Structure formats: structure tokens, C-alpha cells
Amino acid sequence: MRSQQSLEEIAELYGLLENIKKEYEDGIHSVLRKSNPELFSNPHTIPKLKKISINRGLGLAAQNTNILKKSITEFTRITGQKPLITRAKKAVAGFKIREEMELGLSSTLRGEKMYSFLTKLIFFTFAQIRDFRGLSVRSFDKAGNYTFSLKEQLIFPEIEYDDVDQVQGLSITLVLDSSTPKSRSKTVDRVLNGMILLKFLRFPLNDCGYYDKYESFGEITQVWDKKKHLRRKRWSQE
């Protein structure tokens, strides 16, 4: 039977989960439409979280049955669902990898489990990281998805110190779903949509760094286009 303290913690977590869902579903639409009605007049252009992908690479250690079983148990506790075992698509002799060899674990969260995991990350997990200074805004990809890594599993409340034989990290990707019009289909627009959503959800992103010195997003776009041109020029020379 659960103790009164654990029941109170569960109730508190559920309350935070409901708050963050309600804030997103009821709040972000009105906030974005008021701040910029031209860009977000269509509700389909408002950024939303589609899924969270969590991965762990084990390498050749996955051939050890005990290590694989412990990793599956940890993943199940952390994510709330049993992970899929990722396998090698083709053999690589130099790395001693055979085709269909077990190499890691992967889990995809949607709906209620996605919001539950996100709430746990924001309110509990990040607070356990020593000297945590926030996450870099440079970890967005061209589609506006955000990927970051956690170095150890001990920062999650479900993992007990005595149960861990080997410290292993996780790679987490927040996949966004936003339909941008043709006028805002550039990479910088997708990244800005991702930043808007994660900031609204109180995700601990660092400030924009050197982007602060630019007066408008148009200047930032020019810098990005210039970098692309230099990159293409370097590739053509090679």
C-alpha cells in the first residue's frame, strides 16, 4: 500500500501535468494570436508538440543479457512504457557488428504519457542536474525539432542509486508539428516556432546568445543565408 507521502507526490505531479496541458491547450492560441495575428491567424500554424522520442545506444554491451534487461527495466520506469530494441540494419566488419544485432533501445511517447514525461523533465529532472545552466538554443534541427542528451539516469526519480551498476545516458528529441505557410517556410521560421513553444511550456532554454545583437529576424535570416552560401562554396572547392 502506498504511503501518504507518495500519494501526495502523485497528486502534486498529476496537478502539474493537468496545469501544463491546460496552459498549452487554452493559452498558447490566444497568446500567439494577440501577439502576432498575421502569422498565427490560422490555428494550424500554431506550433504543437507531436511526440517525444527517447533513445539509448548500448553498442556491443547490448549482447550482455543482464545489461540489456537492466536497461529495458530502467527505460520502462522512466518512460512508462516498454521500449523497442533497435537492431543493426547491415553488418559492419570493422566494428564487429552483424546484421540484426541488438544495439540499443528506443521509445516514442504520445498523448498523456508525452505530457507526463515532459512535466517530469521540467519540474523534477532538470533540477537534479549538478550546475545546470539551461539547454542550448542551438540544438534545433532544420525542421524545428529539439534534441538534447542527459548524461545519467540517476536524475530521474524512478531510478534508485543501489539499482544502478553502470551510469548510462539518454538522447531525447522533442518532435514538433507545425504547418508553416510558404512565406515562413525557412529554417529560421521553424526554429523560432520551436523556441516559442518550448519557452511557453517553461522549458529551460538559454537566451539566444549572439542573436541578441540583431534588431530584427530579417538580419538573422541574412546571416543564415550567408553561412549556407559559404558552406556550398567550400563543398564545391572540395
Curated annotation (Swiss-Prot):
It comes from the Eukaryota. InterPro entries: Ribosomal_uL5, Ribosomal_uL5_bac-type, Ribosomal_uL5_C, Ribosomal_uL5_dom_sf, Ribosomal_uL5_N. The keyword S-adenosyl-L-methionine does not apply. GO terms for cellular component: chloroplast; cytosolic large ribosomal subunit. Transmembrane segments: none annotated. GO terms for biological process: translation. It is found in: Plastid, Chloroplast. Keywords: Chloroplast, Plastid, Ribonucleoprotein, Ribosomal protein, RNA-binding, rRNA-binding. Its main location: plastid. GO terms for molecular function: RNA binding; rRNA binding; structural constituent of ribosome. PANTHER family: 60S RIBOSOMAL PROTEIN L11-RELATED. HAMAP family: Ribosomal_uL5_B. Belongs to the universal ribosomal protein uL5 family. Binds 5S rRNA, forms part of the central protuberance of the 50S subunit. Part of the 50S ribosomal subunit; contacts the 5S rRNA. This is Large ribosomal subunit protein uL5c. It comes from Thalassiosira pseudonana (Marine diatom).
